[in-house]
Amino acid sequence: MTIFARDLIYRIETKVLLPLFLVHLLPYVTCQQESESVDRNRKTNFPTETVIAIIVLAIFISLSMVACFLHKTFYRAEVEAASQEVFHSRARRGLEKELVESFPIFLYSEVKGLKIGKGGVECAICLSEFVDKETLRWMPPCSHTFHANCIDVWLSSQSTCPACRANLSLKPGESYPYPITDLETGNEQRDEHSLLQLGTNLDRFTLQLPEEMQRQLVSLNLIRTSNMTLPRAMSSRQGYRSGFSHGRQTLRRAISMSLSFSLQAASVRSTVGRDDLVLETSQAKDKDLCEQSFQHLMPEKV
């Protein structure tokens, strides 16, 4: 619409008004005729031609001013519209799908027994408490956990954590925003987005797990994503199932190892306690026997 209006005004000025203006100026540049009759006719026609020329000039100037005003107005409106579109497009931009899928995913029942703190943990997006059979996605940079479906929709248009507004996007040169642990070698690479220390920031949106379990979740997620990108000789569905089942088995092994370690520690503590109790009892008995023997050795009072 703006381009059409500018073109129309330009055509009117160049093809209609400008020729009329030049035509009315022609009598003033012609040579003067020597006959008196022609001079009298020019004197009688001078006022009319002058008025017409002034009117045409005024119309030309007015249209030029209107064209300049419309050009500035429409140009400013176009610039503002373009800036608003860029702003909204940046605001709607979320995280890449590959980055979202790199965040660990698991069932709540698999880690429920190992979480730190009392009380339930709930999703900050739908405000529903987690149940055993629900699939969760864990944000390693801030340890906040959400339903996988809820956080996937959120991160499609946002790049921050819904609970703490931490920036989850990658910086240039980074591959993952959290530590990567190799299951075979046990090597760990830490960057500035390190995991939160245990016992800190315990709230209803934070799923705090032991540090070893955190590393296991990250590593198992890497195995699952690598198995999902197998060659096309295998179907994508089979690759996903094999990767997910393998990750589940390894996660169960890690949980069982953690539980067995806890049970062993508890049994050791109980054994040590029983040994201390037996030792104290035997020492008390020995002390009583010594006192009795000492009393027997003492001479009787006369």
From Swiss-Prot:
Phosphoserine: modified positions: 226
Origin: domain of life: Eukaryota
Gene Ontology cellular component terms for the protein in this record: membrane
Pathway membership, UniProt: Protein modification; protein ubiquitination
Keyword annotations of the record: Membrane, Metal-binding, Phosphoprotein, Signal, Transferase, Transmembrane, Transmembrane helix, Ubl conjugation pathway, Zinc, Zinc-finger
Molecular function terms from GO: transferase activity; zinc ion binding
UniProt-annotated location(s): Membrane
Coiled-coil stretches: none
EC number: 2.3.2.27
Signal peptide limits: 1-31
Zn finger (RING-type) location: 123-165
Enzyme class: transferase
The record's note on its domains: The RING-type zinc finger domain mediates binding to an E2 ubiquitin-conjugating enzyme.
Similarity field: Belongs to the RING-type zinc finger family. ATL subfamily.
Protein's UniProt name: Putative RING-H2 finger protein ATL35
Organism lineage string: Eukaryota, Viridiplantae, Streptophyta, Embryophyta, Tracheophyta
Gene: ATL35
